[in-house]
């Protein structure tokens, strides 16, 4: 697994857990990584670069949540965000953050990573659901955003 994939998966787990327990996402991310290393600071069990990328993603999503959710709501025809599975919604949030605020990551890489994470963590139809909405959003994102 690549460092960035590991970071995306950690970020997803932190955002999902934040939704469930209404706790600060950074605290949740730290707690998740500590559970891998039995209460210590993140060690070899969690790659430090993956942790840093996950932290960047979590902070980016939390800081820009209103704009990100607005884009998702705008393009998710016939789906209110309240009806979306929390896993799918948080995968979308992470990917939309990358599309809007990380122009150094190619759109096709962001989309492919989101689809792969959806296959691993989501329901049977999550990958196609995520792909459909991200395709709509990606087509409206300019390189200047």
Swiss-Prot record:
Involved in transcription antitermination. Required for transcription of ribosomal RNA (rRNA) genes. Binds specifically to the boxA antiterminator sequence of the ribosomal RNA (rrn) operons. One of its GO terms (cellular component) is cytosol. It comes from Geobacter sp. (strain M21). GO terms for molecular function: RNA binding. It holds the Pfam family NusB. Keywords: RNA-binding, Transcription, Transcription antitermination, Transcription regulation. One of its GO terms (biological process) is transcription antitermination. The gene is nusB. The keyword Membrane does not apply. SUPFAM superfamilies: NusB-like (SSF48013). The keyword Cell membrane does not apply. Belongs to the NusB family. This is Transcription antitermination protein NusB. InterPro entries: NusB-like_sf (IPR035926), NusB_fam (IPR011605), NusB_RsmB_TIM44 (IPR006027).
């Amino acid at each position: 697994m690549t460092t960035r994939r590991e970071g995306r998966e950690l970020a997803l787990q932190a955002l999902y857990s934040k939704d469930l327990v209404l706790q600060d996402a950074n605290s949740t991310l730290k707690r998740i990584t500590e559970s891998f290393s039995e209460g210590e600071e993140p060690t070899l069990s969690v790659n430090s670069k993956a942790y840093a990328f996950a932290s960047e993603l979590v902070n980016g999503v939390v800081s820009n949540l209103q704009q990100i959710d607005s884009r998702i709501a705008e393009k998710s025809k016939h789906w209110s965000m309240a009806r979306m599975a929390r896993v799918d919604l948080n995968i979308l949030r992470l990917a939309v953050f990358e599309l809007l605020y990380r122009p150094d990551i190619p759109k096709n890489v962001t989309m492919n990573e989101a689809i792969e994470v959806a296959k691993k963590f989501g329901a049977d139809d999550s990958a196609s659901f995520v792909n459909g909405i991200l395709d709509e959003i990606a087509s409206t994102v300019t390189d200047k955003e």
